[in-house]
A protein has these predicted regions:
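Short N-terminal alpha-helical targeting/association segments
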Residues: 1-2, 174
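N-terminal leader/targeting and accessory segments in enzymes
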Residues: 3-4, 10-11, 17, 22-84, ...
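Low-complexity, compositionally biased segments
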Residues: 5-12, 149, 193
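ATP-dependent carboxylate-amine ligase catalytic core
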Residues: 33, 37, 52, 61-73, ...
């Protein structure tokens, strides 16, 4: 005010809410809650056989989606495969579809920081809450298929097998009009098939 110096004792313009007032705490704790739950989903997936250990099989993934009601059949899919440039191509196609008014899903790999980056809806990574909800839907069925595989003397579902089906469930729940799906390790035995 016209060069007037403010007394250092005067309160700041920024309002500090007293601890326990409830202001802002609910949103923060809810965000933290879902982030921690999503981290638990990621940990459960990472505890499985790694995605770079390809098992030449599709039947376990087929069994899992069958028990879930084939969520991947709810939307159209553009399947992107190749040696190089899959993620870029997937992103270009997904953006073009969005520009034409379609609700899109995008499945790419790898993620850099957080698992959610692999699964995007309308160009944005899926929320922690959506990831957790889909996981809660499929986890009991994953256990059933793992038990069936163990009874047949086969290894459990791998990281990528479960992730592919988790993605199918996330996109069905959204729901999306079209999924642009990047092949994981590629080839005939890729779980995205």
């Amino acid at each position: 005010r016209d060069g007037e110096q403010l007394d250092a004792e005067q309160p700041s313009c920024r309002r500090r809410w007293p601890a326990g007032s409830g202001f802002g705490e609910q949103a923060l704790s809810e965000e933290t809650y879902w982030a921690e739950r999503a981290a638990g989903v990621e940990a459960a997936l990472l505890a499985r056989v790694p995605e770079n250990k390809i098992r030449p099989r599709l039947d376990p993934t087929r069994r899992l989606v069958e028990l879930l009601g084939d969520p991947q059949k709810i939307y159209r899919i553009i399947h992107v495969t190749g040696t190089n440039g899959k993620t870029s191509t997937t992103r270009f196609i997904e953006r073009l579809l969005r520009e034409h008014g379609l609700r899109t899903g995008r499945f790419t790999s790898p993620h850099l920081v957080k698992l959610n980056e692999r699964l995007s809806i309308d160009g944005e990574p899926v929320s922690d809450e959506a990831l957790v909800a889909a996981w809660e839907d499929i986890a009991p069925i994953v256990e059933i298929v793992d038990a069936e595989l163990a009874a047949a003397d086969e290894g459990p579902l791998t990281f990528f097998e479960v992730l592919a089906v988790l993605g199918f469930a996330v996109f069905a729940d959204a729901p999306v009009d079209v999924l642009v799906l990047e092949v994981g390790m590629g080839g005939e035995w890729d779980s995205t098939n």
